[in-house]
């Protein structure tokens, strides 16, 4: 479902100028012109949040979570699935090494996952990737 929503939205908003795909596990990627990023992220979140509740029982949807067992066998409440989007862009700073893209994405993904619900976090820092952040990413 996630990949279908992603590829549909990217295609609708960028035509052949964008790309969306599955990296592995629960990780996906899309590439587009910076000018399309906000519209893509907002549309992805809107559509994902619209279809995902249909995969849950009515009681779980109402509660906002499911009761289940985690990987270690512990009883836990898991919230209804949401999207955490990390936006890495070269709009404000040069990214000269592919490894920096992964590093920045990882930093932003942690920030996104710390927030409730479906969100996107955009890297607006202007300093080089190897230096300390100037400000909190948004």
Task: State where each predicted segment sits.
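Active-site-proximal alpha-helical element of nucleotidyl cyclase-like catalytic domains
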Residues: 1-16, 48-51
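Short, conserved charged micro-motifs
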Residues: 36-41, 95-97
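A short glycine-enriched loop-to-beta-strand structural element that forms part of the catalytic core
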Residues: 19-22, 56-106, 119-125
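Flexible, glycine/charge-rich interdomain/linker segments that couple
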Residues: 91-92, 111-138
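Protein kinase-like catalytic domain
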Residues: 52, 106-109, 113
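Two-component transmitter module helix at the DHp-CA junction of histidine kinases
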Residues: 11, 49, 53-60, 117
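Short beta-strand->loop micro-motif that forms the acidic, two-metal-ion catalytic signature
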Residues: 21-35
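Short amphipathic alpha-helices in soluble, non-transmembrane regions
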Residues: 41-48
């Amino acid at each position: 479902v996630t990949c279908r929503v992603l590829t549909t939205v990217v295609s609708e908003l960028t035509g052949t100028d964008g790309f969306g795909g599955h990296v592995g596990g629960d990780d996906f990627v899309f590439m587009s012109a910076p000018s399309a990023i906000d519209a893509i992220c907002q549309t992805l979140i809107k559509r994902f949040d619209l279809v995902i509740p249909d995969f849950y029982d009515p009681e779980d949807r109402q509660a906002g979570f499911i009761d289940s067992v985690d990987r270690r066998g512990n009883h836990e409440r898991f919230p209804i699935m949401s999207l955490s989007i990390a936006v890495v862009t070269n709009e404000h700073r040069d990214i000269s090494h592919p490894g920096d893209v992964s590093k920045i994405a990882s930093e932003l993904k942690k920030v996104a996952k710390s927030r409730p619900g479906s969100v996107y976090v955009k890297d607006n820092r202007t300093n080089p990737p190897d230096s300390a952040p100037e400000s909190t990413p948004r």
